[in-house]
Amino acid sequence: MIETDKLAAERIIAATPTSSHEEVFERALRPRQLDDYVGQEKVRGQLEIFIEAAKRRSEPLDHVLLFGPPGLGKTTLAHIIAREMGVNLRQTSGPVLERAGDLAALLTNLEANDVLFIDEIHRLSPVVEEILYPALEDYQIDIMIGEGPAARSVKLDLQPFTLVGATTRAGMLTNPLRDRFGIVARLEFYDADQLARIVRRSASLLNAHIDPSGALEIAKRSRGTPRIANRLLRRVRDFAEVKADGQITAAVADAALAMLDVDPVGFDLMDRKLLEAILHKFDGGPVGIDNLAAAIGEERDTIEDVLEPYLIQQGFLQRTPRGRVATLLTYRHFGLSAPDAGNAERGMWDTPAGK
């Protein structure tokens, strides 16, 4: 998994933050109010109502679970929730909370109606999760004092608070934890027009000059993800300042992204390497994952966790019982003639695919 994480961090079209410097950059561009938050209309509309109702009753907002692919704005929404409620936000992540005492220290320092944001909440340890249950339901925690026969349990009362949990893997949450969230919201990929609005807003904050056509060109290659759109904007801005007097047009954006090896649908070299291997080395598939990994010189986990999800989600790749198969979209993307349906069907089921 270390190598997988390393490759993900090195890709300019990675949906996860590539560095601590990028996280600082993201914070500077983060919208501060729901009115400034672009996209996710359904989730935004729900939160507007729930937040206003909680404020009118002078109560904490119900606990909120935000899930969906990385880079879509879960952390941003957590900050907006706290700001709209007019309370403090304390932020941590599941892997950081190793002991029950770590969580207890956070909870006991919360003020009334504060927001506690736990990123990667699916990675909480079972011990920490057990402490969290009574805190969420009754605003109380039980802690053990002393050791051995002298040990005793002490119940501590907490201030009412709101937990905002974020995860990219909602299926890994335990049922007892999931059931304690009153508000559950899934964040979806953005369309090109929404991303273009985000790019124009970010460009304004960066004092970058961008045409609507330039913003749309960046948006189309951002894989439906605001984090990627903002990262590409930074690189295109650099290119424009050196090669185009600082003005980002569609042509400038296209030239900059071509230099970065990001093609018109947002594929990078690794995406194309995988798809071209299936097309040219395995006649479009099916091909087993181990054979494919050997053919492109990557680890199996890297293919499954880093490369494949977006290709499958966009319809360029299929997983079948016999292995990976390139779709008609893939043939069209590379300007190739697709095999006729009869040959494709025989290839899918009759050609040995390897392990």
From Swiss-Prot:
ATP binds at residues 29-30, 71, 74-76, 137-139, 180, 190, 227. Mg(2+) binds at residue 75. Its EC number is 3.6.4.-. GO terms for biological process: DNA recombination; DNA repair. It holds the Pfam family RuvB_C. It is found in: Cytoplasm. CDD domains: AAA. Belongs to the RuvB family. The RuvA-RuvB-RuvC complex processes Holliday junction (HJ) DNA during genetic recombination and DNA repair, while the RuvA-RuvB complex plays an important role in the rescue of blocked DNA replication forks via replication fork reversal (RFR). RuvA specifically binds to HJ cruciform DNA, conferring on it an open structure. The RuvB hexamer acts as an ATP-dependent pump, pulling dsDNA into and through the RuvAB complex. RuvB forms 2 homohexamers on either side of HJ DNA bound by 1 or 2 RuvA tetramers; 4 subunits per hexamer contact DNA at a time. HAMAP family: DNA_HJ_migration_RuvB. This is Holliday junction branch migration complex subunit RuvB. It comes from Burkholderia ambifaria (strain ATCC BAA-244 / DSM 16087 / CCUG 44356 / LMG 19182 / AMMD) (Burkholderia cepacia (strain AMMD)).
